[in-house]
Amino acid sequence: MIEADRLIAPISNHFKDEEVIDRAIRPKKLADYQGQDHVRDQMEIFIQAAQMRQEALDHLLIFGPPGLGKTTLANIVANEMGVNIRTTSGPVLEKAGDLAALLTNLEENDVLFIDEIHRLSPMVEEVLYPAMEDYQLDIMIGEGPAARSIKIDLPPFTLIGATTRAGSLTSPLRDRFGIVQRLEYYKVADLQHIVQRSAQCLGLSMDSEGALEVARRARGTPRIVNRLLRRVRDYAEVKGDGHICAQTADRALNMLDVDHQGFDYMDRKLLLAIMEKFSGGPVGIDNLAAAIGEEKDTIEDVLEPFLIQQGYLQRTPRGRIATDRAYLHFGIEK
């Protein structure tokens, strides 16, 4: 879909080649983890307490919009605990045996990270309950009348689940997490620190004003700020002397069609469709998806959260409504 081509998409299949760079610039310690102060402070205490007791950290659920650092935080937790981390995702674990193979290969206090945990199948989820609660695995051996259940003891471990849809988790699964952390959109100042650190890791020349210009257009999302940094770097190397200042960043981002609010053509398309085609709303999600040629899930999970948080869009029981701020942004009269 169109969403996959967006430069400011928190999730995109078109930037897989840059994952290697992302891994290289990811922080490895809580001390280097910018923003999310409440999460960092709490996790520091929980990790130190678990280490003092020489126990596995309680199971941890991390939720929030895409691109905010859920995977990064999971890796930091494992690194701070001094244990191994095994990574998988909900859709990959199709059968109970897939999960059992991972669990039986864990060492004491290791971390098992499941991304998109809300997409686990009910069959796999049932196996996970006793593993989380009692560190035991219930396995069925054989078929028919000869089938029998055996219990396998597991070493203490920490399950870290990540999701963009905490509400989609079943209550039995959600209640088994001892620690629940919500990641919020980042402040511009925190993103400025992140982009300056990334520039340093990549060996780029960038001043604080250039970092601020990139940060304010990144929609509160670290993944986006790092992607914009790489595109601004390309512009600075080709059109300038390689140094990234505010003017260079502004020109590069304008060329990339990312405005001062962090909107790109998809954001403008969505808001303008509501204002011009549906008289400002309310408009239902099905009609809106058809009008802009995008999937409903993409609108709800990727496009809308930032627009709602910034006050440009309202999501009501009757449908979506463009706010006065949206009309003001586009210079359109109601």
Swiss-Prot record:
The entry's Mg(2+)-binding residues are 71
InterPro entries, per this entry? AAA+_ATPase, AAA_lid_4, DNA_helicase_Holl-junc_RuvB, P-loop_NTPase, RuvB-like_N, RuvB_C, WH-like_DNA-bd_sf, WH_DNA-bd_sf
Q: Where is this region: Head domain (RuvB-H)?
A: 260-334
Q: Which PANTHER family match?
A: HOLLIDAY JUNCTION BRANCH MIGRATION COMPLEX SUBUNIT RUVB, PTHR42848
Q: Which residues bind DNA?
A: 315, 320
Amino acids binding ATP: 25-26, 67, 70-72, 133-135, 176, 186, 223
Which UniProt key words apply to this protein? ATP-binding, Cytoplasm, DNA damage, DNA recombination, DNA repair, DNA-binding, Hydrolase, Nucleotide-binding
Q: Name one GO biological process term.
A: DNA recombination
| GO molecular function term, any single one | four-way junction DNA binding
The name this protein carries in UniProt is Holliday junction branch migration complex subunit RuvB
**Known role:** The RuvA-RuvB-RuvC complex processes Holliday junction (HJ) DNA during genetic recombination and DNA repair, while the RuvA-RuvB complex plays an important role in the rescue of blocked DNA replication forks via replication fork reversal (RFR). RuvA specifically binds to HJ cruciform DNA, conferring on it an open structure. The RuvB hexamer acts as an ATP-dependent pump, pulling dsDNA into and through the RuvAB complex. RuvB forms 2 homohexamers on either side of HJ DNA bound by 1 or 2 RuvA tetramers; 4 subunits per hexamer contact DNA at a time.
- The gene name on file is ruvB
- Where is the segment annotated Small ATPAse domain (RuvB-S)? 187-257
Assign the protein's first listed, main location to one coarse class. cytoplasm
In terms of SUPFAM superfamilies, this protein maps to: P-loop containing nucleoside triphosphate hydrolases, Winged helix' DNA-binding domain
Tell me what reaction this enzyme catalyses. Answer: ATP + H2O = ADP + phosphate + H(+)
Q: Where is this region: Large ATPase domain (RuvB-L)?
A: 4-186
Q: Which organism is the protein's source? A: Vibrio cholerae serotype O1 (strain ATCC 39541 / Classical Ogawa 395 / O395)
What NCBIfam families has UniProt attached to this entry? PRK00080.1 (NF000868), ruvB (TIGR00635)
| Subunit record text | Homohexamer. Forms an RuvA(8)-RuvB(12)-Holliday junction (HJ) complex. HJ DNA is sandwiched between 2 RuvA tetramers; dsDNA enters through RuvA and exits via RuvB. An RuvB hexamer assembles on each DNA strand where it exits the tetramer. Each RuvB hexamer is contacted by two RuvA subunits (via domain III) on 2 adjacent RuvB subunits; this complex drives branch migration. In the full resolvosome a probable DNA-RuvA(4)-RuvB(12)-RuvC(2) complex forms which resolves the HJ.
